Amino acid sequence: MRIGLFAVGRLKAGPEKDLAARYLDRFAKAGPAVGLELARLVEINESRAANAQTRKREEAAQLEKTLADGSLLLLLDERGKALDSESFATLLGTFRDGGKRDLMIAIGGADGLDPALHARADAVLCLGKMTWPHQLVRILIAEQLYRAVTILAGHPYHRA
């Protein structure tokens, strides 16, 4: 299964971008052994619309343009379901084994994600109940993707 990462906001050069890239590179190298591959990273600028509802709608339209037909959609949202790393790995394995070719993981902007995306999403997860800046969310999900691959492969990286 091809996994894409969609992010509202761009990472500037620096340690956050380097660390996210390091984990995505590890995921890209280890993933094919368990049937997962990094398809692409899509970054968009935050909308400059006057109100939050319009900003979310504009950002959602950009996301919709990137989705392949029949693609699964996983949203990262502070009101989503919290999973431990093993459960996240299991979810990815279930998605992979379900016959869909593409999964897009979406990181929203400062205003969150449009309700229409929530209605269309196959899963809505959180990385804990705290609010995180998108730079850290990018690092956290990149690391969890790599960790999920190691769990699915039985690699000792994950020691729970």
UniProtKB/Swiss-Prot annotation:
Homodimer. S-adenosyl-L-methionine binds at residues 76, 108, 127-132. GO terms for cellular component: cytoplasm. This is Ribosomal RNA large subunit methyltransferase H. It is found in: Cytoplasm. Belongs to the RNA methyltransferase RlmH family. It is an enzyme of class 2 (transferase). Keywords: Cytoplasm, Methyltransferase, rRNA processing, S-adenosyl-L-methionine, Transferase. It comes from the Bacteria. Specifically methylates the pseudouridine at position 1915 (m3Psi1915) in 23S rRNA.
